[in-house]
Structure formats: structure tokens, C-alpha cells
């Protein structure tokens, strides 16, 4: 009897928090659409980033209060009043950026260009002057300019969600940006014990709850002189830090669908005992 009730609870909670996220994004998008042509660029950027932080903080609060997630994002707080830096996390889940953006009121984010036209995310991203990644030269130029104005740049070096253990190949753009902006790169390690919203996970598929999700800081690299050497060191740092991470269990299989089915079944059986 307990197992069916737990499954029903997990469906209700997962759908409820996704619905809340959609509502937050839609309401904020309407506000951002109105404000974008009215506010001066600098004011609009600050307002946009603060609004995104506040909205996603409400979402993260719902994850905690419903018991869906056990979140530990406190490590990012130490960067809040520091000098400009590139924050470079691994990327196991679709909501990684959303959760990181809750911790700092002035984070620029490099994101996929198609998200800039997304009905849920596009207007807010444009108001916050987030940086699309479809044109590498322009992306690098915009990222360097933003860092020179202060604040933090969130850039996932993999360029997409992690598909293999421990990490995908890294994109050299992070090294180029750090070199030209003359700012350090702070590695952030995301650890999670559930493949919820990983690459290949259907949006409305039930996760096994609660999910443990933790962010910790790794090495901070000085601005690189040689980008190739830096990228080699950066990949080594991620591999060392992610050795034995909880997500290794479900990243080690190349067949995502088979591995996700097996994981869900084993997790459900364990939670029902």
C-alpha cells in the first residue's frame, strides 16, 4: 500500500513544481516584455537579473518545501561579493542554471540561442541581457564586455547537459573568454543522486523523490595565458572532482533510455521497501 501512495505523491509533487515554474516564467515574461523597451539598458539588465533570481528562488523554495529536493547551494554564496569571475559548473540536469541563478543578483548567463525565443524564458533572458551561444565570436565579445562591467558569468563548459561519465568534452570558448577578460575561472561541482531532467529524460516523467542536489566549489584557475593548456587542466580538474560522484551510477551507460528505465525501476523498488 505504501508504494502506490508514494508513486502518486511523486507524480503530484513533480507536476506541481513544474506547473509553478511555468507560471513564474510566464508572469515574469509578460513583465519583461513590457519593461524591455521602457528601461535604460543598465537599469533593465539589473532589474532583469534580480527578477530572475527572485523568481527562481521561489521555485527552489517550492522544491524544498514540498520535499522534492534536498538542496545545498550555499557554496555559491561565497562568490556573491567577490570580483568578476566565470563560474564553470558541470551540467547533469535541465534545472542547473535555474538553481545557480538563485544565489546571486548579478549573473550573466551564456545560453542556447533557441531559448532566447522560448515563450517561457525568452523575454526575461533578453531583459537580463543573457548571451546567446549560436555565434561564437559575438558570444565571446559580449561575455568579455559583461565581465569587464563586474559581476559573474555562468558558463557551462560542456555546452549541453552531461551525456557521459564523468563529463562531456569541454568547449574552448571558456578559456578564450577568461583570457581576453583577464578573469579567473571558478570550477563548480554539481552532484545529484537522480537522473531527473538529465539529457533524454522526458519532462513529465516521474522522478523518485526526494532528490539530493549539492553544489560545491572546486579549483579556481587564474586567467589563462595558454588556452590549450588551460583546457587540459580544466578537464582534469572536473574528472578528479567528479570521481565517485552520485551521478556516475546513471551516467556510465551510453544507452540513456535503457539506463533510465533500469534506474527508475530499481529506485522505486528501493523506496517501496
Per-region residue spans from a language model:
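A generic structural signal for well-ordered alpha-helical segments
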Residues: 63-64, 125, 146, 178
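Catalytic core of membrane glycerolipid acyltransferases/transacylases, capturing the structured
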Residues: 31-54, 66, 81-135
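Thr-Gly-centered strand-to-loop micro-motif
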Residues: 74, 111-112, 134, 157, ...
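A transmembrane-helix-recognition feature enriched in membrane-embedded lipid enzymes
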Residues: 3-72, 123-124
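Glycine-rich helix-loop-beta junction characteristic of Rossmann-like nucleotide cofactor-binding loops
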Residues: 75-80
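Short glycine/serine/threonine/alanine-rich loop segments
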Residues: 69, 130, 183
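Short gly/ser/thr-rich secondary-structure transition/capping motifs
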Residues: 66-74, 133-137, 197-200
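Non-catalytic C-terminal accessory region of glycerolipid acyltransferases
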Residues: 4-8, 137-273
Amino acid at each position: 500500500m505504501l508504494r502506490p501512495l508514494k508513486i502518486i505523491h511523486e507524480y503530484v509533487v513533480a507536476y506541481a513544481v513544474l506547473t509553478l515554474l511555468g507560471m513564474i516564467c510566464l508572469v515574469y515574461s509578460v513583465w519583461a516584455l513590457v519593461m524591455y523597451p521602457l528601461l535604460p539598458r543598465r537599469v533593465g539588465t539589473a532589474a532583469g537579473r534580480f527578477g530572475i533570481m527572485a523568481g527562481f528562488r521561489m521555485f527552489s523554495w517550492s522544491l524544498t518545501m514540498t520535499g522534492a529536493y534536498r538542496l545545498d547551494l550555499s557554496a555559491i554564496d561565497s562568490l556573491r561579493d567577490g570580483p568578476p569571475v566565470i563560474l564553470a559548473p558541470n551540467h547533469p540536469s535541465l534545472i542547473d542554471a535555474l538553481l545557480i541563478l538563485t544565489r546571486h543578483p548579478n549573473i550573466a548567463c551564456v545560453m542556447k540561442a533557441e531559448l532566447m525565443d522560448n515563450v517561457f524564458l525568452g523575454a526575461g533572458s533578453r531583459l537580463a541581457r543573457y548571451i546567446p551561444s549560436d555565434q561564437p565570436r559575438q558570444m565571446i565579445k559580449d561575455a568579455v564586455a559583461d565581465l569587464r562591467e563586474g559581476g559573474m558569468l555562468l558558463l557551462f563548459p560542456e555546452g549541453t547537459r552531461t551525456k557521459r561519465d564523468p563529463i562531456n568534452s569541454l568547449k574552448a570558448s571558456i578559456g578564450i573568454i577568461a583570457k581576453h577578460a583577464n578573469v579567473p575561472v571558478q570550477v563548480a561541482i554539481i552532484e545529484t543522486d537522480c537522473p531527473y531532467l538529465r539529457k533524454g529524460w522526458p519532462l513529465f516523467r516521474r522522478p523518485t523523490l526526494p532528490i539530493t542536489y549539492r553544489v560545491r566549489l572546486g579549483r579556481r584557475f587564474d586567467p589563462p595565458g595558454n588556452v590549450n593548456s588551460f583546457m587540459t587542466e580544466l578537464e582534469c580538474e572536473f574528472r578528479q572532482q567528479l570521481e565517485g560522484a552520485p551521478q556516475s551510477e546513471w551516467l556510465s551507460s551510453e544507452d540513456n533510455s535503457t539506463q533510465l528505465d533500469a534506474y527508475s525501476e530499481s529506485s522505486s523498488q528501493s523506496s517501496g521497501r
